[in-house]
Amino acid sequence: MRNSLSLAAVLLGLPSCVLAAHGDALQLDQQLITASRTGHSPVSIASSNLITRDEIERQQAGSVPELLQRLAGVSITSNGGRGKSTSVSIRGTSDKHVLVLIDGVRVGSATSGSAALQSIPVEQIERIEIVRGPRSSLYGSEAMGGVIQIFTRRGGAEGFKPYFSAGAGSRSSYSGSAGVAGSHGNGWFNLGVASESTDGINARAYRSSAPNAFEPDADGYRELSGHLRAGYRFANGLELDGSWLQSENHSDFDSRSSSGASGRDAYSDGSLQAISGRARFSPLVFWDVTLQAGHSEDLGDNFQDGRFYSRFDTRRDSASWQNDFNFGEAQVLSLGMDYQTDRIDSDDDYAEDSRYNKGYFVQYQAAFGRHGVQAGLRHDKDEFFGSHDTGSLGYSFDLSDALTLTAAYGTAYRAPTFNDLYYPASNSTAGNPDVKPEESESYEIGLRGSHGWGEWSVNAYENRIEDLIVWAGSSPMRPENVDVARIRGIETRVATVLAGWDLDANLTFMDPQDRSKANHGHLLQRRAKRQFNLDLDRQFGAIGLGASLYAASERFDKASNVEDSRMPGYALVDLRSEYRLDEAWRLQVKLANLFDRDYETTQTYEQPGRALYFTVRYQAL
């Protein structure tokens, strides 16, 4: 763990780096902004979800992937238990097609192409916004399947309000968090720390094809994190907002060779950091300017046989300038530019270890009576592969006060990673500097309703991805643009109150087809065709009861869909309860995987069985 949490002290001493949140008197930050990059949007077209702090605590979730799995169109695969490598898929795309932001700053590895969502501490999160569908016209590369934006905890009521939690559970699992939030006048802040540890489970199952590789041990996980977020609004309307989040983690994993002679005592030490700052001001009554700067790090050292084995570090710096022109309440024109540099460091010698990208975007949003329009264009220029243009068009029509019809079209792309382009050549693997960006084209239509009894929505979509980058061949294996995928799906959701119980359910039907010549018509790897989620909650005075059901159909671990790669469908049931001692104190208990179901999301990797967790929470009023 090479970074120190003492960085908080540096930030506390640099108020000039604390920059801006969108907002009207510091309130606009509570609105969804990811779908449009604006605090005020006259239309609502994108298929999206919001997970609030209250929901995070009610669900008693232990990780970000656990929270995301209960959403329509989102699926999770994991290489073992808590803290192990985890992939999040939106609408059948890969984890490399999902853009992850923390307080507006892009995070993730520039070598692997994915973000370590399993290492983002839930105790430091205020809310999560999830947008399904392409958003490259606003954000550029990676936003093919969707965008996940995580916002750290922010200030609360006037004065200083401490909070803390402590938990314990199965497999010697322990967690704790503490912080203080508050505000005074036009300023606010939130400062917190959190830690967790677990002995975990045996990450990898016994394989008859490699019996000597079996390592029957518990693969544990430890994490220590801290965050700081603060903001101030001056009398002249200038708003400053800044945040810092850092998570240090240690994760054991199984990596013994087929002969059993090497790869023992394998573990990784990782560090994730995101620093963001924004300033917002209005030169004219209709013109809002937002300046943002950010820095993120994804660092990882791997060890085998108790010795250093490999290092893959990513450091990203970014800046953006956005201008929002508000023509009344019904029209917003946004013009902006983004600049980003990626730098990698590895024990391997890459041909290139840095690159930059410039992006220019324009977006128009308008509401005309019962009609809504959202249109965007973006031009990106990458240092290595050149220019790329993307666009989007959305339309909504209010059939009545309760029913809205939506339609959307968008193009997107994903730039090749440093591994794709420059992975050092060996007898087994080598990068390919000629590989091109992946491209996609997506269509969507939806209908949603809001009534006295609740709300519901139905969305149907098709996404076609071309020039998929696949590592193929042998001696060495190299990445090539060879594959095509066509993903069709229907997502449904209903939320209501039934017999006094709050009910929230969603059902996803998906046909994630591989359209390449070799595997035409097969399911994409590790994608399920059907998923169902059901949440039930009810309050009985001071006692709250809840239950969650998650079910998924079979999936295949190999692109060929051969029988020996089939992973059966499964269903999981969780129970939870909460007792309020008073308005400040709560006792919580959760029983996960009630029926102790054995299942896999990645072949040969185990998943946790039945587990019991207890938590006590305090929040000063």
Where are these regions (language model features)?
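N-terminal periplasmic "start-of-domain" segments of outer-membrane beta-barrel proteins
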Residues: 28-59, 87, 95
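Extracytoplasmic beta-strand/coil segments of soluble accessory domains associated
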Residues: 65-105, 109
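Short acidic/polar hinge/loop motifs at secondary-structure boundaries
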Residues: 105-132
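Periplasmic-side early beta-strands and strand-to-turn transitions of outer-membrane beta-barrels
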Residues: 136-137, 149, 155-159, 163-167, ...
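Face-selective signature of the C-terminal outer-membrane beta-barrel domain
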Residues: 231-249, 266-398, 454-460, 497, ...
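Outer-membrane beta-barrel signature, preferentially recognizing the C-terminal barrel domain
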Residues: 259-282, 312-315, 383-384, 398, ...
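Gram-negative outer-membrane beta-barrel transporters
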Residues: 329, 333, 367-370, 460-464, ...
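Outer-membrane beta-barrel "beta-signal"
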Residues: 446-448, 608-621
